[in-house]
Amino acid sequence: MSLKIRLARGGSKKRPYYQIVIADARSPRDGRFLEKVGSWNPMLGKDNEKRVELNADRIKEWIAKGAQPTDRVLKFLAEAGLAERAARSNPEKAKPGKRAVERLAEKKQKADALAAATAEAAE
C-alpha cells in the first residue's frame, strides 16, 4: 500500500478548505483516508498562523513509515522545517523558442537594413 500525505478538499463552492491527510495513493482525492494530520485554509492571509496547521509528531511518524508527501504538502512541510525540499531548476524553459529566435533575427536584419539606408541617404 503506497501512502501519500496529500490534500483533501472541503469547504463550499468558491470557498476552499483543505485537510492534510494520510491516504492510500489509489483512493479518491476526497475519499477514504487513514488519518487527518493538518489543515490548510487558503482563504486566510499568508501571515495568519492558522492558515496552515500541522501535527508535526504524527507527520514525522508517517514519513518514517514511508508516506510520501505531494508537492504542495512538501512545500508546507519545508516551511515548517519538517522536510527538505530541493530547489527546482529548468534552464531550458527560460530559453526562447525556435520561432522567437527567427523573429528576432528578422527584426535585427530589418533594423540593420534601415540603418544602412539612412546612413547612405545622409551622405
Swiss-Prot record:
Annotated Gene3D superfamilies: 3.30.1320.10
Q: Positions of the region Disordered?
A: 85-107
- GO MF annotation, one: structural constituent of ribosome
Q: Does the keyword Ribonucleoprotein apply?
A: yes
Q: Which GO terms describe its cellular component?
A: cytoplasm; small ribosomal subunit
What SUPFAM superfamilies does its record include?
Ribosomal protein S16 (SSF54565)
Which parts pass through the membrane?
A: none
Could you tell me the Gene Ontology terms of the biological process aspect for this record? translation
Which Pfam families does its entry note? Ribosomal_S16
Sorted alphabetically, which keywords does the UniProt record give? Ribonucleoprotein, Ribosomal protein
Family membership, please give it.
Answer: Belongs to the bacterial ribosomal protein bS16 family.
NCBIfam families per record: S16 (TIGR00002)
Protein name, entry field: Small ribosomal subunit protein bS16
Supply the source organism for this entry.
Allorhizobium ampelinum (strain ATCC BAA-846 / DSM 112012 / S4)
